[in-house]
Amino acid sequence: MSEVVVANNANINPSAAAAVGATSVALTLGGSSTYDETSDFEGGYLVVNDATGEGRVYSINYNSTVSAGTALTVYLDDAIETALTTSSEVTLVKNPWADVVIAAAGHVHFAAGVPLVTVGSAASVPQFFWAQTWGVCGVWDDAATAIGAVLQSGTTAGQVEVGDGAAQPVGVQLYTGVDGEYYPKFLTIAP
């Protein structure tokens, strides 16, 4: 799962206007946001959610280093198409496949995929692995599950259960599932 969304990354006013053709946007983050690497938002998105430029989405190439409450500059893959003002509001979205965590109860994350290897939950060093996001995959059932059921992350880390409509669907059950066993699902996270 993607890491928990940081509230301070939403509804941010640019600290300076960004003209058409600009490839960077200066922002001032509030609260406890701390980004100590220039890759924190690499592959993520800057979404203009209100005022001038709203509706535009820009892919982030990289960002400057910053501590809480200070300026952050995001460098974009493409140029600004509609000028941003200091009244524009933007939201920063990290790459959904960066800094993933093992699914836990509460369904507060974006499901990033199903790893086909065991991934440690308390590793102090980053672990790299491939996660399947689409197609037939053996996934651990949290309960008996009927064929055709739409699935979401389960209440036990690493398991899936029948969706309740409140969480992101992750796939469809292909065979009647048994609690605690790995049965085939068709994942629908990202093609």
Regions found by a protein language model. Give the residues of each.
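Short conserved beta-strand and strand-loop elements enriched in small hydrophobics
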Residues: G43-D50, V90
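Extracellular receptor-binding modules and their adjoining Ser/Thr/Gly/Asp/Asn-rich linkers
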Residues: M1-T28, S32, E37-T38, E54-P191
